[in-house]
A protein has these predicted regions:
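Short alpha-helical elements
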Residues: 1-178
């Protein structure tokens, strides 16, 4: 197997993981690899290395730009995710309501549920709207740099964000002025 096809399969695996939000160890690795089946930890190692050195963000921007016509951009969804971090991690904190350590992130998806952007994870001791203006700027500037037009998008967010953004005034400012 060539290095190029190997990397394509690794990227397909990562995209599947991001779309399904399944735990790394639960993913069906044998269905992704045509040659030697890689262990999920090997694929996670690639993802972690690429994320840390900025390569994944570049690749993600290229993927979004290349396939932008397949995205459902009639509206975008904004939501938060709380992930249990039983073994700890770089950005985890105790969340009282869940009685465990968690990490939180904000996601933007298209109308089909395809992930477009994800914020930098924060400690679970913070709620979804922690540093909301900075988080939204981070999310939508990344989308802009990939060639997606975000100005004027219809944004669907849950009620927690409505409270934090004063009926979406901050979100609208971000979407129209990036």
């Amino acid at each position: 197997m060539s290095q190029k096809s190997y990397l394509v399969e690794v990227i397909q695996y990562i995209l599947y993981k991001l779309k399904t939000d399944c735990q790394w160890h639960m993913l069906p690795v044998s269905s992704f690899f045509t040659g030697r089946v890689l262990h999920y930890k090997t694929v996670y190692g690639h993802f972690r290395k690429w994320s840390r050195n900025g390569e994944w963000e570049k690749v993600w921007g290229i993927i979004l730009h290349r396939y932008r016509f397949f995205l459902g951009m009639s509206s975008v969804e904004l939501d938060g995710s709380h992930t249990t971090a039983l073994r700890g991690g770089e950005r985890c904190g105790y969340q009282v309501r869940n009685k465990r350590k968690t990490t939180n992130a904000i996601y933007v998806t298209d109308s089909q549920g395809i992930p477009l952007a994800m914020s930098t994870p924060v400690s679970g001791s913070h709620n979804d709207v922690y540093n909301s203006s900075e988080v939204l700027s981070e999310l939508f500037s990344g989308l802009n740099s990939s060639g997606l037009i975000v100005s004027g998008l219809f944004l669907n967010a849950d009620v927690g964000f409505e409270f934090a953004f004063g009926h979406y005034e901050s979100i609208i400012a971000v979407l129209f002025f990036i």
